[in-house]
Amino acid sequence: LFRSLIGIKGTRGVGKTTFLLQYAKEKFGTDRSCLFINMNNFYFSGHSIVDFAYEFQRRGGKVLLIDQVFKHPDWSKELRLCYDRFPNLKIVFTGSSVMRLKEENLELRDIVKSYNLRGFSFREYLNLQTGMKFRSYSLEEILSNHEQIAKGILSKVRPLDHFQDYMHHGFYPFFLEKRNFSENLLKTMNMMVEVDILLIKQIELKYLSKIKKLLYFLAVDGPKAPNVSQLANDIQTSRATVMNYIKYLADARLINMVYPKGEEFPKKPSKIMMHNSNLMYSIYPVKVDEQDVLETFFANTMWKDHKVNKGDKNISFMVDEVMPFKICQEGMRIKNNPGVTYALHKAEI
């Protein structure tokens, strides 16, 4: 840790708490100069972060790991005070992806380094399941050398044997737990709406059912442009409120908003997709279209390091505004266009 204030954001369920605990174990072991605290603890209902940090560093504390920091009132002001008063104390805190860390907390804008923790990529999932250590490749490397890369991987494992399992349950780390994954994910999704969105955006509880209903309608409709007027009528609220709710769901990493090149929120997106394919199987498993799943996987994978826009006719996505991609399920007829890159399902090389 080179900075004294670091924020770890990420959607609920991707392993932020585990990340902090692993860091403490690997870097400090039983050394008590590093301490993990959770703002869910009732102790912090009657004590401030600043007072706790003062006492901790007075007793030799050097690194304070704070989980779910947004559960504490005035957390951003208190972190600023800690930063100013205890220059030798390093603080790492976790928060929800719904938090607009720098935009909505001006006192932290210039002093906090923010990172986003994502769910597992297919490569990470494959490594976990097979014990391999495949390295990551940039998009440029894959486009220029995909045959050699694929041959190297296929000499060790057959990725297609694991791909459908990843699409169904491989994005969130809790698939490793020996519990019902879908039930666990549904609970996590409910927590995203009930805690992350309502608490952080300070929305009254009576509107919870409207947000849940909106998420359900968006999921069932599949990837397409939302009919905002119809959705407003369905959940009995205004068009402006529907658009705000859609933005909150996107911030919570429950959906992705895909725009044409040059457009962004608050304009209506040209396509709304679930954030990852695991969500599709949990929220409405009886209506999961393979082409929709493949496009959701591609968009989610690209979003980490690239800009993703809706493509023109016969193009699924435009990546980084210059690379057109067409996502093709098995058996789909392809009109070979040399200017388009085709992502083919079940084509090993």
Model-inferred region functions:
Residues 5-8:
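Hydrophobic anchor at the beta1->P-loop junction of P-loop NTPases
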Residues 96, 102-209, 215:
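Interdomain motor-coupling "hinge/lid" segment immediately C-terminal to the ATP-binding subdomain
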Residues 298, 302, 315-333:
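Conserved catalytic cores of phosphodiester-cleaving nucleases, focusing on short active-site segments
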Residues 174-313:
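Accessory nucleic acid-recognition modules appended to NTPase machines
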Residues 16-17:
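Conserved lysine of the Walker
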Residues 65, 90-96, 116:
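Structural recognition of the conserved hydrophobic beta-strand(s) that form the central parallel beta-sheet
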Residues 31-63:
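Short glycine-rich substrate-engagement loop in P-loop NTPases that contacts/grips substrate
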